[in-house]
Amino acid sequence: MPPKAGPTPIANGDQALTRSDFTTPEEVNEVYRRRARFYDWSVNAYYLIGFRWWAYRRRAIAALGLQPGAIVVEIGCGTGLNFRLLQASIGLSGRLIGVDLSTDMLQQARQRVAANGWSNVELVQARAADYNFPSGVDAVLSTFALSLEPRFDEVIAKAAMALVAGGRFVLLDLRMPDNWLRNLAPMLVWLVRPFAVSLEVAKRQPWKSLQRHFSQYSYQEGYLGLVYIAVGQQNEDEATGRQQTASWRAA
């Protein structure tokens, strides 16, 4: 029996990507290298199909329950689209750490930070699963990014260890719906393929990891079940126990 034909390559200048999956960090990085300069305005195209993505971002950030002076880590911060909303909550006495795989997206974020004169922002180029959270984090946010990381469970586990008592991890992302729209999966994935989403990525379920690592958990869906906001909150016993465990391991 002859071998099955591989996926059709797509010419992209520097390298050929495939139509199957953008799952490796290298492939995701390449997608956002090419999209970085135009990312901010390109995402607005989804308003044409009724996807009010800014409304979901605001709702996710509100769910963090931030106070002035808070330390926030944003995983997959991209060009820093969420920074203004986060800064409005934490103020200049707070600290904002933006983590992203793409150096090109981070360059756009640096320009945003400089233009606004934010002196409390630290930008880190790293794969999400390889990033080591600082201790004493008040909140962790990821919007439309964590599902692109195959090792998302590691990210959530590390975040749970770093969060203070009462600290929250808020996850806003796309998902495969559990309704009739599931039959339209190939078309739905096609709509978000420009942002490195594949069918395999869409089937990932990081909200279940959030539920597993946090005893306090809430979940809500929107946009016909295609988008969700999940919140995990660290209680005092968990925070104390996990921080002690981390100290023992480091000893």
Label the predicted regions.
Residues D14-G65, L81, L85, Q108, ...:
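Conserved class I S-adenosyl-L-methionine
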Residues G91, E149-P150, L163-V164:
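Helix-to-beta-strand junctions that scaffold the AdoMet/dcAdoMet cofactor pocket
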Residues A129-V140:
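A short acidic, Gly/Pro-enriched loop at the edge of an enzyme's catalytic core
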Residues V73-D130:
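Class I SAM-dependent methyltransferase SAM/SAH-binding core
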Residues H213-A251:
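Core SAM-dependent methyltransferase catalytic element
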Residues E26-E27, I49, V170-L226:
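C-terminal alpha-helical "lid/dimerization" subdomain adjacent to the S-adenosyl-L-methionine
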